[in-house]
């Protein structure tokens, strides 16, 4: 939800440009650009959701965050992104593809540039290890499955 209404990040084929995350994706803590805690090792869209595998750095600060993720204290995930194309849907109207009812703003072409482990996510349906129940043997020390936000407040965009 943006300050003026619902924001939807479209995950349809061709909507998300993952190039930046694939080439130089970083993992931050709470969107702080000076709090790099890891790197993105793999990113993809599947089932209209974004997914990523990350690797935490080995420094003390990153290790602290990794431990909080592993213990379940930190569960929130968010993405920083840029939008190239918006569809504005007026109250009570349908989006061009008929999937959404207004009022809302739909990012039809957008590019994530960072993934953050966050204390308080804008969208509580997205987070760390949502698929870990299916893969209990996964090694959280080296990589964690993440889902990107569909709805995201981008308070830290500069």
Question: What kind of region is each of these model predictions?
Answer:
Residues 1-140, 157-158:
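Signature of dsDNA virion morphogenesis modules
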Residues 143-158:
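Polycationic, low-complexity disordered segments in secreted or periplasmic proteins
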């Amino acid at each position: 939800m943006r300050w003026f209404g619902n924001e939807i990040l479209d995950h349809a084929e061709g909507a998300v440009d993952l190039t930046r995350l694939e080439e130089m994706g970083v993992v931050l803590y709470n969107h702080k650009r000076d709090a790099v805690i890891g790197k993105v090792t793999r990113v993809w869209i599947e089932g209209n959701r974004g997914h990523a595998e990350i690797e935490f750095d080995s420094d003390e600060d990153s290790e602290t965050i990794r431990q909080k993720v592993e213990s379940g204290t930190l569960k929130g995930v968010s993405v920083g992104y840029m939008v190239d194309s918006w569809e504005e849907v007026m109250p009570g109207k349908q989006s061009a593809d008929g999937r959404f009812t207004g009022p809302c703003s739909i990012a039809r072409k957008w590019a994530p540039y960072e993934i953050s482990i966050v204390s308080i996510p804008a969208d509580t349906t997205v987070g760390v290890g949502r698929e870990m129940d299916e893969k209990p043997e996964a090694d959280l020390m080296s990589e964690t499955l993440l889902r990107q936000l569909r709805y995201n407040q981008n308070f830290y965009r500069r």
